Design a protein with these regions (language model features):
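Short proline/glycine- and polar residue-rich coil/turn motifs
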Residues: 52-61
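Short edge beta-strand/strand-turn motifs with a hydrophobic/aromatic core
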Residues: 63-71
Length: 195
């Protein structure tokens, strides 16, 4: 989870080098696939240099994409996101080993989207995903803040967390509300009938 005050963020794409690590830096090319991309350069992300460097002595390196959050909606209910389709291209000293190149899709958004582990680690026991529920878990234990992995699951302390979350969020003394002022419960969001 990233603080609202941070307006520029960096997405990192890990690249793997096959074979032995090179003793010299290697140049590879990255291009934005325009017909598959909805994100706009200079609005949603900073320009990406075509030539990128794979550092010497490494089998992995990282392509960094600078994301601009100011022009993206932060409302979870709207789920506004932009697609950035990237393609690696070979260069004189960096062969991809795949004739048609390698593509990677990066989805850019400015809201808390469901972490990878939400369903898998807990087999649905955390109920539907809502950012307010995730914020509570993070407040209790920073281990929950990682989007990609969580050390807890239904077989360890995770069971205590989801049982406590259910009791906590359903208790009127701990009421939490979504961005439209609707009460968030463990298993639903209360929306007035007139809406």
């Amino acid at each position: 989870m990233i603080a609202d005050s941070i307006r520029i963020d960096t997405a990192r794409i890990v690249l793997h080098y096959s074979g032995n690590a090179s003793e010299q830096e290697r140049i590879y090319h990255v291009k934005v696939v325009q017909d598959s991309t909805t994100a706009e350069e200079g609005i949603h992300y900073q320009p990406i240099q075509k030539e990128q460097v794979f550092r010497p002595g490494r089998l992995t390196d990282t392509l960094k994409i600078v994301v601009l959050r100011d022009n993206m909606n932060s409302r979870f209910l709207d789920k506004e996101r932009y697609r950035l389709e990237l393609e690696l291209e070979p260069s004189e000293d960096f062969d991809l080993g795949i004739r048609q190149g390698i593509r990677k899709t990066l989805w850019l958004n400015n809201y808390m989207s469901e972490p990878v582990w939400w369903e898998g680690n807990f087999h649905g026991r955390l109920g539907f995903f809502h950012p307010e529920k995730w914020k509570i878990l993070i407040n209790w234990d920073k281990e929950f803040a990682n989007q990609d992995k969580c050390k807890y699951d239904q077989n360890n302390r995770g069971q205590d967390y989801y049982n406590t979350l259910r009791s906590y969020i359903n208790n009127d003394a701990n009421a939490v509300y979504d961005e439209d002022g609707h009460r968030v419960y463990f298993d639903h969001v209360e929306v007035p009938e007139e809406e």
